[in-house]
């Protein structure tokens, strides 16, 4: 049974500005594995923007929003061998989810981008 859905769209040029500003934004928002993945891509800013959109869409789907006490770099988006993205949560995130919504969601995520924008759609079920 579907428990939550979320969607978010991110302007890629704005994401590039935030990452290039050298303010530590990249490390605050993305895990080391995500940074390695995005930096390996020819169009790295599209990958960063899509992952950022996924994190915001996830928080919307769960109903806790971006201002909740979850560090975004603790929610990781990685890919399986076929390239399908999926979420990996730290124990800290799992504990916060258990406290806030009573379970750790089995979230599905879809990412896409054009030259200007990235979008993510998240749907989750209760395990």
From Swiss-Prot:
Main localization of the protein described in the UniProt heading: cytoplasm
Any Pfam family matching the protein: ACPS
Swiss-Prot/TrEMBL cofactor(s): Mg(2+)
Positions that bind Mg(2+): 8, 56
Alphabetical list of InterPro entries matching this protein: 4-PPantetheinyl_Trfase_dom, 4-PPantetheinyl_Trfase_dom_sf, ACPS, Ppantetheine-prot_Trfase_dom
Catalysis: reaction(s): apo-[ACP] + CoA = holo-[ACP] + adenosine 3',5'-bisphosphate + H(+)
Keywords carried by this UniProt record: Cytoplasm, Fatty acid biosynthesis, Fatty acid metabolism, Lipid biosynthesis, Lipid metabolism, Magnesium, Metal-binding, Transferase
Record localization: Cytoplasm
Gene3D superfamilies in UniProt: 4'-phosphopantetheinyl transferase domain (3.90.470.20)
UniProt name for this protein: Holo-[acyl-carrier-protein] synthase
